[in-house]
């Protein structure tokens, strides 16, 4: 544990308060085990290239993890990968690719995006397909306890069997709509799917009730408990997951007799024109497209600058304002380095700690950082090098918690997007190979579809005598 962590307090003495969706209020964070924190973050369904809406949750809860770790907590942080899903199967089939190859390709894309933005790698990153045994065991427990039933190869959760169903989202049982469509095997259309019976051409696994594949809600429960146990501290994800996904996770865990998550944290969406950023709405901004406008550290600063529970309305003006703010911090630190000497990481301020302990109030924490920058610049201009160095050291400590310390070697080159673009090149080359195969078999529609998808992601393909070449599409700044 560092001296600066000891100065603020560690373990249960930290004073951290978090908004718990289940309670509908801010609560003191009291971990299940003193000095330890167990966190599960719902990760990506790897069906396509990540956009900034996808990675916001990664950035938001990376700050929580960094704050806990810096204050002496031993943090187990699990982020799953959903690598089997209707959308993955459909998109892979449309592209003429094996489903597992499609999922693995975009899993790498998400890993590259998280890494480009400085999100710490999780303690473990389980794939759904690697935990089928645990899912089957969970479903068997639910059937044995009378909370689930098999019908025609499918297995459903009996919503009416659980009196507290709807406690997270506040949905009354009469208002529940699972969004699964009508299924003939359901006893009640409010029931949700735990296991889907095998269909021709789809992957399947053997179970006591026949071959099939897992339902989305079952995947996360099994992986949570496999890595964190039947009860753990924090379950996190986007606010769009509150219902039905997280509600249905709770139903399964409680139906099986497990305590499950003690705190539920949800981040707000990234919006454009007031609408949630979504591929179905066509208003997404892929990570490669944004990284052609700003550096990775600047994008991280932007995504983390709003309170994690608030909506983050994307606009070019807001993005450039974040760039200007980050550059101001960076320039001050470089001024101190050039005039005074290298800047060590010092201690954060009490106001910064109070802000993060108040439900991760990053906007207030950033205000403290910019106040320190202003004071440091004044000190530097007046020749007070000691004060300037003190402020710079404090700023480094605070920016390090936010994951974007400009003097960290990850960002210091001022060209931190290069690694991300190398990762993008791997993905684009795979797409171009798929396009070439489609052209060879004269499937012009498939070839054009691949080219169009790349263009939507901000990548332009030009056919040359030496083969297809790609470049990032120039955007107006």
UniProtKB/Swiss-Prot annotation:
Binding site for ATP: 279
Cofactor: Zn(2+)
Subunit: Monomer.
Record-level GO BP terms: cysteinyl-tRNA aminoacylation
Pfam families with a match to the protein in the record: CysS_C, DALR_2, tRNA-synt_1e
Motif ('KMSKS' region): 276-280
EC number, as in UniProt: 6.1.1.16
Placement of sequence motif 'HIGH' region: 44-54
Keyword Nucleotide-binding on entry: yes
Record's GO cellular component terms: cytosol
The protein, known as: Cysteine--tRNA ligase
Keywords (A to Z) from UniProt: Aminoacyl-tRNA synthetase, ATP-binding, Cytoplasm, Ligase, Metal-binding, Nucleotide-binding, Protein biosynthesis, Zinc
UniProt cofactor note: Binds 1 zinc ion per subunit.
Record's catalysed reaction(s): tRNA(Cys) + L-cysteine + ATP = L-cysteinyl-tRNA(Cys) + AMP + diphosphate
Cellular localisation: Cytoplasm
Sequence similarity: Belongs to the class-I aminoacyl-tRNA synthetase family.
SUPFAM superfamilies: Anticodon-binding domain of a subclass of class I aminoacyl-tRNA synthetases, Nucleotidylyl transferase
Residues engaged in binding Zn(2+): 42, 220, 245, 249
Native organism: Mycolicibacterium smegmatis (strain ATCC 700084 / mc(2)155) (Mycobacterium smegmatis)
């Amino acid at each position: 544990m560092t001296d600066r962590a000891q100065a603020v307090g560690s373990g249960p003495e930290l004073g951290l308060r978090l908004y718990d969706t289940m309670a509908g209020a801010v609560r003191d964070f009291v971990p299940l085990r003193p000095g330890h924190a167990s966190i599960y973050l719902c990760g990506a369904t790897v069906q396509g290239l990540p956009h900034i809406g996808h990675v916001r949750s990664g950035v938001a809860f990376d700050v929580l993890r960094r704050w806990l770790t810096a204050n002496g907590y031993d943090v187990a942080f699990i982020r799953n990968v959903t690598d089997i899903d209707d959308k993955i199967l459909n998109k892979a089939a449309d592209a003429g690719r094996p489903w597992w190859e499609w999922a693995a390709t975009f899993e790498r894309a998400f890993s590259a995006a998280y890494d480009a933005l400085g999100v710490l790698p999780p303690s473990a990153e389980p794939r759904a397909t690697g935990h089928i045994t645990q899912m089957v065991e969970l479903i068997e427990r639910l059937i044995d306890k009378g909370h689930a039933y098999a019908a025609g190869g499918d297995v459903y959760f009996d919503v009416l069997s659980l009196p507290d169903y709807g406690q997270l989202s506040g949905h009354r049982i009469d208002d529940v709509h699972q969004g699964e469509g009508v299924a003939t095997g359901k006893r009640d259309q409010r029931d949700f799917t735990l296991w889907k019976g095998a269909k021709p051409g789809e992957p399947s696994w053997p179970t006591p009730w026949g071959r099939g594949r897992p339902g989305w809600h079952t995947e996360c429960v099994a992986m949570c408990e496999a890595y964190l146990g039947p009860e753990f501290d924090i379950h996190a994800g986007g606010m769009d997951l509150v219902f039905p996904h997280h509600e249905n996770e709770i139903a399964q865990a409680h139906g099986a007799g497990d305590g499950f998550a003690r705190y539920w944290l949800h981040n707000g969406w990234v919006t454009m024109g007031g609408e949630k950023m979504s591929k179905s709405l066509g208003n997404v901004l892929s990570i490669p497209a944004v990284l052609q406008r700003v550096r990775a550290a600047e994008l991280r600063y932007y995504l983390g600058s709003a309170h994690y529970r608030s909506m983050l309305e994307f606009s070019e003006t807001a993005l450039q304002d974040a760039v200007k703010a980050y550059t101001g911090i960076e320039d001050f630190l470089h001024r101190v380095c050039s005039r005074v000497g290298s800047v060590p990481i010092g201690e954060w301020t009490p106001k910064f700690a109070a802000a993060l302990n108040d439900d991760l109030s990053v906007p207030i924490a950033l205000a403290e950082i910019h106040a320190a920058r202003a004071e440091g610049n004044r000190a530097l201009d007046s020749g007070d090098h000691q004060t300037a160095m003190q402020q710079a050291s404090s700023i480094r400590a605070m920016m390090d918690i936010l994951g974007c310390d400009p003097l960290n070697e990850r960002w210091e080159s001022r060209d931190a997007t290069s690694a991300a673009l190398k990762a993008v090149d791997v993905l684009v080359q795979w797409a171009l190979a798929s396009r070439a195969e489609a052209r060879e078999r004269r499937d012009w529609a498939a070839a054009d579809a691949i080219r169009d998808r790349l263009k939507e992601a901000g990548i332009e393909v030009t056919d040359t005598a030496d083969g297809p070449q790609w470049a990032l599409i120039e955007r107006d700044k």
